[in-house]
Amino acid sequence: MTWSQDLAHKTYSIRHWADGYFEVNDAGHMVVMPLGGDGVRISLPEVVDAARAAGAKLPLLLRFPDILRHRLGKLQAAFVQAQSEWEYAGGYTAVYPIKVNQHRGVAGVLASHQGDGFGLEAGSKPELMAVLALSRQGGLIVCNGYKDREYIRLALIGRKLGLKTFIVIEKPSELRMVLEEAKTLGVLPGLGVRVRLASLGAGKWQNSGGDKAKFGLSPRQVLDVWKVLRGTEYADCLNVMHFHMGSQISNVRDIAKGMREATRYFVELSRLGAKITHVDVGGGLGIDYEGTRSRSDCSINYGLQAYASHIVQPLASACEDYDLVPPRIVTECGRAMTAHHAVLIANVTEVEAVPEGRVPGLCDDEPAVVRHMREIYGELDARPAIELFYEAQHFHAEGLAAYTLGQIDLVHRARIDDLFYAISHGVRERLSHEEKSHRPVLDELNERLVDKYFVNFSVFESIPDVWAINQIFPIVPIERLNEAPTRRGVVCDLTCDSDGTVKQYVENESLDSALPLHVLRHGEAYRIGFFLVGAYQEILGDIHNLFGDTDAVEVAVDGRGYRIAQQRCGDTTDVMLDYVGYALDEVRRVYAQRITAAGMSAAESKALSDMLEAGLTGYPYLSDVPLE
């Protein structure tokens, strides 16, 4: 099949996971469209080159703040349309939970939205302090998470300062503290209750919903809260009903089921006399990381409009059936707002090609196991390929055991490997996925016969969910996409850890154990993009092997196309050492002592001292200069 632009899109499933923000251009470059498909197209290789010319280094995180604004606009538009279709008059507010990505360049861009259609959520005291500064005057702030008196006091101060803070009661003991602190400060609190739904969305994040969820009140506890408030001056303060169905909900039916249960809570609380003005449905809106449009954990089988409709319809029907005032619908869809806006770019530093295998020449003292392997290779065109592979596996294992027992030497051990790889390649050439019986062996061979692409980044720092929960992220070369990839490879990071490897890849609307990649060219960079990393990854990233934050740039759309609006340097080695307790003055003193003790000339001592200082203050990652 002739390679083409369309085939590039299909190979990497780009059109399905990109959601209109990324595509391949005629030059074979990945391009970003921060304003959606009808807006400006920006070449990612050109952006990286411009950032490097300005001093940035790879690995490099690219942020596109215009995507944040566009995602927020699409979310709001979907609910406007759904409310119009269902004749729902309650209104809608998109709340951003800053735990998803607390960086000022993310939360601040979203918070710059003016109007009732946007709010912020905090789940800790530090997040609350940030949100109190970010929110517009009169803006909605949802205060979630476990709380002490200081947290509660700060939230109440926000209300005194003109912010619409709502303290969501997550456990019964919080209510007493809220009422006591409100009385002390002389302010009527904004209150909410988080109800714990029995409905449970399937997937990796299912524990955030359901009866066993970490947060939320049981039906009895909800009644107890209302019992305390009823008949007091605080009864009218209970305005928010909050719940959470899960995160990254893959199946739209789980959303419908959760909303049916949650709507019953709204109806019952209203019938008891609570003035619920806001129903906060929490998160759950997923991202199709896989591009499979399925119920798989890292995919979704619905679109944005379907999500909005499944949220609005049950509430619209309940309000009509029970003659209730429609509450304002609130969502906390942070993943859907932020995932697309960030792309990590990293360069391949080296490739370890899978052995092609060869047939060694005969020798007089050849062990029987080597002869058997040679015979198998000679029968590739005479016997069923699958049977030959099974026999090769048997004798390969026999050869390894013989080597371990000292029965064969290293030379013959290497010959066994050479023959096994030659047989494996020969078997794979003779199998087809069209034949159902071939698929298990073909899948095994495709997993075994892959190159290792060593990439200048850390899985644990930049895409930690790959290691932690087997999260899927689309990975695509950002250039040479007008050429057919001729190799299959796995991505390995720089860390001294076998878990620093990506094990699953998006390919042809499914998942595979390897990725189609290109052969490296001497003196030419080969750069790979890790897409949809804007939610959680920066915040969850750790410092395994002392690899810290990468360099980052913000790329903004302007009248000429784009501009690099802001550049942030990543962590340097001295910063990482200081973080784990090293006294840098002492480190430098030890270096100086050892240089003096080595008895070198003044010039050599100065040169070594300068190199040590450069290493101490340099970027922890490898040089991004192409291999010669």
Curated annotation (Swiss-Prot):
Residues involved in substrate binding: V279, D280, V281, G282, G283, G284, L285, G286, I287, D288, Y289
InterPro entries given in the database record: Ala_racemase/Decarboxylase_C (IPR009006), Arg_decarb_HB (IPR040634), Arg_decarbox_C (IPR041128), Arg_decrbxlase (IPR002985), De-COase2_CS (IPR022657), De-COase2_N (IPR022644), Orn/DAP/Arg_de-COase (IPR000183), PLP-binding_barrel (IPR029066)
Pfam families in the cross-refs: Arg_decarb_HB, Arg_decarbox_C, Orn_Arg_deC_N
Keywords noted in UniProt: Decarboxylase, Lyase, Magnesium, Metal-binding, Polyamine biosynthesis, Pyridoxal phosphate, Spermidine biosynthesis
Residues bearing the modification N6-(pyridoxal phosphate)lysine: K99
Catalytic activity: L-arginine + H(+) = agmatine + CO2
Coiled-coil blocks: none
EC number in record: 4.1.1.19
Molecular-function GO terms, alphabetical: arginine decarboxylase activity; metal ion binding
Keyword Isomerase: no
Protein name: Biosynthetic arginine decarboxylase
Species assigned in the record: Xylella fastidiosa (strain M12)
